[in-house]
From Swiss-Prot:
It is found in: Cytoplasm. The gene is zapC. Interacts directly with FtsZ. This is Cell division protein ZapC. It comes from the Bacteria. Belongs to the ZapC family. It holds the Pfam family ZapC_N. One of its GO terms (cellular component) is cytoplasm. Contributes to the efficiency of the cell division process by stabilizing the polymeric form of the cell division protein FtsZ. Acts by promoting interactions between FtsZ protofilaments and suppressing the GTPase activity of FtsZ.
Length: 178
């Protein structure tokens, strides 16, 4: 069962845990992956989960449904993505980690894309689509960028769009019935 946003949800920063949190109810708090040093100043005051957040929640839940993730993991992904969209500090592109692809794509917010490094391939969710570069959330466990640098799952990176390729769509498997 998927949780549904409501008027009582509140974003707040927890200094003790150094994390942006989302109060879902009196008994449930979601801890994002993001620390204070990664956040814009407005994240340090309590903010409501607004109508735009709710719209993005439903948009992204529809997009990530094609991932082979459990619903709780999809919700975790989407809430982290909304936190990035709303509270993450602006980033400069770090495209050099990834190889160029041809033809270049122009992704949209919520698109699932792939990017390759010399050490492997990763899947990403586009959080903010730009004309030249987009902010992406890593969906791969500890993607190796270089011999000394990894990008953790839910890590955020801005990349030029010519590094992205569409995520292959899984083909339905049918068995022949006689």
């Amino acid at each position: 069962m998927c949780i549904q946003p409501n008027d009582n949800w509140q974003w707040h920063y927890d200094a003790h845990d150094d994390r942006l949190m989302l109060d879902l109810s009196d008994r449930m708090i979601f801890a994002t992956e993001y620390k204070g040093r990664q956040l814009v100043p407005s994240s340090f005051t309590t903010q409501p989960f607004c109508v735009d957040d709710a719209a993005l929640y439903y948009q992204l839940m529809d997009r990530v449904a094609e991932l082979e993730w459990s619903v709780p993991h999809q919700v975790q992904l989407v809430l982290n993505a909304i936190a990035v969209s709303r509270f993450y500090k602006p980033l400069m592109p770090q495209s050099w980690f990834f190889g160029e692809t041809h033809p270049a794509i122009i992704p949209e917010t919520g698109a699932l894309v792939c990017m390759g490094t010399p050490h492997g391939k990763g899947e990403f969710l586009v959080i903010e689509a730009g004309e030249q570069a987009s902010v992406c959330l890593n969906l791969t466990d500890d993607l190796i960028l270089t011999t000394s640098k990894t990008l953790p799952r839910f890590g955020v990176i801005k990349v030029m769009n010519n590094r992205m390729s569409p995520r292959p769509v899984a083909q339905a498997q049918y068995r022949q019935v006689s």
